UniProtKB/Swiss-Prot annotation:
Full protein name: Probable E3 ubiquitin ligase complex SCF subunit sconB
PANTHER family with a match to the protein in the record: UBIQUITIN LIGASE SPECIFICITY FACTOR/HREP PROTEIN, UBIQUITIN-BINDING SDF UBIQUITIN LIGASE COMPLEX SUBUNIT
Organism of derivation: Aspergillus fumigatus (strain ATCC MYA-4609 / CBS 101355 / FGSC A1100 / Af293)
Record's compositionally biased regions (Basic and acidic residues): 1-12, 302-313
Family to which the UniProt record says this protein belongs: Belongs to the WD repeat MET30/SCONB/SCON-2 family.
UniProt GO BP: protein polyubiquitination
Length: 696
């Protein structure tokens, strides 16, 4: 070993690092390695003599630490630069050209996902606060230390994926536990990515559709991009589908149906726009747009050398066309509320239903007990034992008109946009133009008072004191009489889709009739008091298997004229509440004929409400809570509302049987109920109608 090499080793000092408290000293300068690793950095053919020293330095005197620093810097620069140039990824920064032609970027490698492309240099955006802090800490170090650290960063930055792994493995192998803990804490934040922004929008929407409303609202607060995705109609339309007019299977939360008035107004707006649309009266710019484009294109073909003036003219014309198109977008575009706002509105109403937050309006005007009512939008119709029908404005509480013509008390009524039909104890039904108060026609067919009626499409059914159900067909003017009950028929319900009718009677039974065969296809037994109401539930209503109670101890069902049989003996009954084929109702129901409503609810003077499955005749649930007979009943997919002799109104969950809320206020028995998505109305023998609105 010559003197020069010996003095160089002495300048470095020992190559062995010391350990303090199990950790390498953080104050040790970061210089180039000693003699043991000298050749690995410089290459096998390089020596110290090949490197020039600073002017004025001599090889004869000993090499101190300060005289060796310029040598190390030159050595580092001489060896780092080729490494950097050799390992720069071509797709990130191609080096020069080949044969005078630019270097072509290779096609994307489909074997790797977007996060693992070893052929590309990482373009991850730098974290500004972190880099500022790093820069300040670096500036506190000596210049030589800064250069050494910068060289290490440069080598790692230019290294390919395989080299980077080796470098990291070597570094972590020399780290102590505190340093490894620091790496773990730092990496935990660095590996977090904005996956919603990185993924295609379709996949992002799919992910967001699995979140609940609270999580979606929090996601919208992350960034502008997340807000745009989380507030998109794709996500909230799915949320509305899951919750509006039905109970969500995941969270058990259900929201009221959209306002029918709003739907009808939207439909009328579309029809009005379609009816008044005239092609000859298009907004300015629509008709001439294509002609302008065609002329500009033709001019450019005829005079390709016309110069900048023609080009500017074409640009001005195109700009004018675009601006005109933007101005005319509103002419064609229909304005819709964002689905998030729709959900927000319905959620507010649903919350008010849950906690009983509502406003109350009382309608007074009848001189005797109110026996029937119905409301739609801002119109309320009530029928009373004073033989009159009153039409009210629900928004102002004003009485609009009174319909007079019946000779006795009015027990039932129903109206739509064009007509109102009423049934009275004077044995007649009357058809009214409720907007003018004119009586259009009177139907006489029962030998007793008419206590129940319902029409759907062109079919009208009426129940009477004479123990019969009469069917009136408005289309072919035909009628038929259904006999089978042994006491008053208090309520009837028509389902025109399946061509069936339900009837409830004082003989404690409920019957299902086939209008094609004019026969009874099912009789439901279970109530021990006179059945006052029967209400089919909407087809959207779903009842879970695990919610079924054992209610068959005192329940039987008769199919047709056969003797009473247990539900398990019925055709098509498999012991489950899954969809039952139409054949369960008899041979008349083939695959092309819709089945009757799957579930019905009934109320009786035995103080109970029952939920039935029509295909099997099973009583799925009995609702207990009223102290006296239940006269009035209304239901939808979310709730059941009942009114009873005990002067109370109760709100029930049809799936659990739980009474969610009780309303009081009437001083007489509650005889009739009307139910909407955001309100309900009750009528009583105290001559009052009380309307509860939850849209506050």
């Amino acid at each position: 070993m010559d003197a020069h090499e010996l003095s160089f080793r002495d300048g470095h000092g020992s190559s062995t690092s010391t350990m303090k408290d199990g950790c390498a000293s953080a104050e040790k300068p970061h210089y180039l390695p000693g003699d043991s690793s000298f050749t690995s950095v410089f290459g096998p053919s390089e020596t110290v003599e090949d490197v020039e020293t600073e002017p004025g330095s001599t090889q004869d005197k000993p090499h101190s630490f300060n005289t060796q620093k310029p040598i190390r810097e030159n050595l580092a620069g001489k060896n780092v630069a080729p490494f950097l140039a050799r390992h720069i990824p071509e797709q990130y920064a191609p080096l020069g050209s080949q044969g005078g032609q630019p270097v072509e970027i290779s096609s994307a490698n489909s074997k790797y996902c977007y996060r693992h492309r070893p052929d590309l240099k990482c373009r991850r955006q730098a974290d500004e606060p972190t880099m500022d802090k790093l820069q300040r800490e670096l500036e506190t170090l000596p210049q030589s230390d800064q250069q050494g650290i910068a060289h290490a960063w440069s080598i790692f930055s230019a290294a390919p994926a395989k080299h980077r792994k080796l470098i990291l493995q070597g570094i972590m192998a020399q780290c102590c536990f505190p340093q490894l803990s620091f790496i773990s804490a730092t990496v935990r934040d660095l590996i977090r990515i904005d996956f919603l922004t990185a993924l295609p929008p379709e996949i992002s929407f799919k992910i967001l559709c699995y979140l609940d409303t609270t999580s979606l609202c929090k996601a919208a607060q992350v960034s502008r991009r997340w807000r745009a995705l989380a507030d998109d109609d794709v996500v909230w339309h799915r949320m509305c589908e899951q919750h509006i007019h039905r109970k969500c299977k995941k969270c058990g939360w259900g929201l009221p149906l959209l306002d029918r008035k709003r739907l009808r107004e939207s439909k009328r707006e579309i029809e009005r726009r379609a009816a008044t649309w005239d092609v000859s009266k298009q907004p300015a710019g629509i008709e001439g747009s294509s002609a302008t484009i065609e002329t500009a294109a033709a001019g450019s073909k005829r005079k390709p050398e016309s110069g900048k003036e023609d080009t500017a003219m074409v640009k001005r014309q195109c700009t004018s066309i675009v601006s005109q198109s933007e101005q005319n977008e509103d002419y064609f575009k229909t304005r819709y509320r964002p689905w998030k706002e729709v959900y927000k509105d319905r959620f507010k109403v649903g919350t008010n239903w849950k906690y009983g937050r509502c406003s109350t309006r009382v309608f007074k005007g009848h001189s005797n007990g109110i026996m029937c009512l119905q409301f739609e939008d801002n119109i309320l119709a009530t029928g009373s034992y004073d033989a009159t029908i009153k039409i009210w404005d629900t928004e102002t509480g004003e009485e609009l008109r009174t319909l007079k013509g019946h000779q006795s008390g009015i027990r039932c009524l129903q109206f739509d946009d064009t007509k109102l039909i009423s049934g009275s104890m004077d044995h007649t039904l009357k058809v009214w133009n409720w907007r003018t108060g004119e009586c259009i026609s009177t139907y006489s067919g029962h030998r007793g008072g008419v206590v129940g009626l319902h029409f759907d499409a062109t079919i009208l059914a009426s129940g009477s004191v004479d123990k019969t159900v009469k069917i009136w067909n408005f289309e072919d003017k035909s009628t038929c009489l259904l006999r089978g009950h042994t006491d008053w028929v208090n309520a009837v319900r028509v389902d025109s889709a399946s061509r069936t009718v339900f009837s409830a009677s004082d003989d404690c039974t409920v019957k299902l009739w086939d209008l094609d065969t004019k026969s009874c296809i099912r009789t439901f037994h279970g109530h021990v008091g006179q059945v006052q109401q029967v209400v089919p539930l909407p087809r959207e209503f779903e009842f879970e298997d695990h919610d079924v109670e054992c209610e068959n101890d005192n329940v039987s069902v008769t199919s047709g004229d056969s003797p009473a049989a247990s539900p398990q003996a019925l055709p098509g009954f498999d012991g489950q509440t899954s969809d039952t084929p139409s054949s369960a109702f008899g041979p008349a129901f083939d695959d092309g004929r819709p089945s009757p409503p799957r579930y019905i609810v009934t109320s009786a003077l035995d103080s109970t409400i029952r939920l039935w499955e029509t295909s099997s005749g099973r009583c799925l649930r009995t609702f207990f809570g009223h102290l006296e007979g239940v006269w009035a009943l209304a239901a939808d997919t979310l709730r059941i509302v009942s009114g009873a002799e005990d002067r109370m109104v109760k709100i029930w969950d049809p799936r659990t049987g739980k009474c969610e809320r009780t309303f009081t206020g009437h001083s007489g028995p509650v005889t009739c109920i009307g139910l909407g998505d955001s309100r309900f109305a009750t009528g009583s023998e105290d001559c009052e109608v009380r309307m509860y609105s939850f849209q506050t």
